[in-house]
Amino acid sequence: MGLLAALALSGLVVVGTVVGDGNPAPLTATPGDAVRGRAIVGSRQLGLCLLCHSGPASADFPQARLQGTLAPSLEGAGARWSEAQLRLRIVDSRRLNHNSLMPALHRSEGLTQVGAAWQGRRVLDAQQVEDVVAYLRTLQ
């Protein structure tokens, strides 16, 4: 196994190749599923996306009063960012903005202030990242 592959498996680097402000290569061979991605984004147990972001004002997220306002709205995310840009923002947004409050959702090493239950664990697995990307791409 090469050094880069070993580091990627360890979580020390972003999985895949970062090109500019994105990660163009999917993390899995299975395409993302937008329906599963929507469930992750709306989940109050897994993704927790709506803790900081607001979602589209539609039947997708009827609980608008419980949505966050700390981070950019997810409405129109698929029009604002490419698939590669969305993927990198989900995997590790601090690669783009070191001061970002958004947690690295697919990195487990080199993080600070991580709760004991999450030490050494990724919030989302690779397929879940691809599912969220697929959902966000539908938000035009």
Protein language model annotation of sequence segments:
Residues 44-48, 56, 128:
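Short pre-active-site segment immediately N-terminal to redox-active cysteine/selenocysteine motifs
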Residues 83-91, 126-133, 137:
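An amphipathic alpha-helix signature
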Residues 31, 50, 54-95, 101-115:
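Gly/Gly-Pro-rich "capping" loops immediately C-terminal to redox-active cysteine motifs
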Residues 116-123:
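Periplasmic OmpA-like peptidoglycan-binding domain that tethers envelope proteins to the cell wall
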Residues 2-12:
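Bacterial N-terminal signal peptides
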Residues 1-2, 15-19:
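Domain-scale selection of a single, long terminal region
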